[in-house]
Amino acid sequence: MLFNVSACDIRDKPMPSNNDINKIDQLERVKKVRKNSSQSEAGSSSSGNSSFVALVKASNLKEDALYLPQDCTSSNGLNKKCRKIFLTDGGDRSWEMDLKFDKNLDSFCITRGWRHFCDENGKKLPNQERFVTVRLVPDCLRNKRLYLSRRFLKNNGLGEPKMVTLVGTDGTRILANLLRESTGRMSLGRGWVDFAKANRLKIGEYFTLESIWENDSPILSLYGTNTSKSDKRKRRENFPVACEKEYVSTEARNRNEPEKDKNTEEMINQASLSENRLVITLVPEDVKAGMLRLPSHFMKANGIDKVGKIYMLGINEMEWWWGDLLTRDGIVSVGCGWRYFCESNGVKIGKSFTLECMYKYDTRPVFKFCPKSGK
């Protein structure tokens, strides 16, 4: 929403609501001030600070308040005595609103009337169906697939396989194909991993995509990222309301796994941080056998009591490796490519590395691989 600041009505006391004559006099005075102010700005101001763009957000609608940019208010003669302000629709209609100065933020704020002004002019929040929030998990990179909500795809005309343009925060565009699997689920395929790397998306991070169409071409634009699911206040400011409620599992569903284990996250207790790290020496015998051994006390301290996959993130948190925990005694099958993963992360045979248990995804532990032991 574009605002063009042209006048401010200065009042020390509220205008009596039962005095029609005073209302007319005040409105006439406002029109006169607006006219004189416009003439002086046209002659003396060329800085372009007489207008600014206001974003309609869930937060300012809920609070019925809008903070004005400091450079705009200072260049247009607003002072702390201003009590009322008029907003127009560019035509004959105008809305009178309260104006106050927030000392803590050193900014002017429109109060009591902002929500009504938005309703009257049809200014609403962006269409919530255009947004979807997903979490980057290791399988997204290993399988080179990003699974998206069926409802999101259907509501945005993406129900059929096609090429989609992915747009990063810096405007970089990468083509990706939207695929339909035999199960009916749809995902982003070729091009998705390059997009994740180009925008430095990290494992465990939440990010929001916005669906945009340009000349009949589908576009998914990176709207924002957030590393903490619990930081609700920050997400309310940056993401649409609907995005706070819908999280999409980005991993292909295994029919043998109980439904209750999906989409769960268990953060490691920070009080036992020292027990989250394990120093291991890369010995030739283990590399040849494709095995990794985790001590029982380490597994117990981190709540690892189920066999299954474990994930290890490289030093750049984009390259990763996974293995199968075969027994509760800590025997892990890491495969024949384990050696190359270690070497690519700066660890050769005979050297030590550190595994730090970061968190769990779907009850599966995720470790950070560090080339220097004890750090």
Curated annotation (Swiss-Prot):
- Pfam families for this protein: B3
Gene Ontology cellular-component terms listed: nucleus
List the CDD domains: B3_DNA
Q: Which residues bind DNA?
A: 51-147, 131-226, 277-375
Q: Which domain of life does the protein's organism represent?
A: Eukaryota
Gene Ontology molecular function: DNA binding
Q: Does the keyword Glycosyltransferase apply?
A: no
Q: Which PROSITE patterns match?
A: B3 (PS50863)
Q: Where in the cell is it found?
A: Nucleus
Q: List the InterPro entries hit by this protein, alphabetically.
A: B3_DNA-bd (IPR003340), DNA-bd_pseudobarrel_sf (IPR015300), REM_fam (IPR039218)
Keywords per UniProt: DNA-binding, Nucleus, Repeat, Transcription, Transcription regulation
Kindly indicate whether the keyword Repeat belongs to this entry: yes
Q: What is this protein called?
A: B3 domain-containing protein REM-like 2
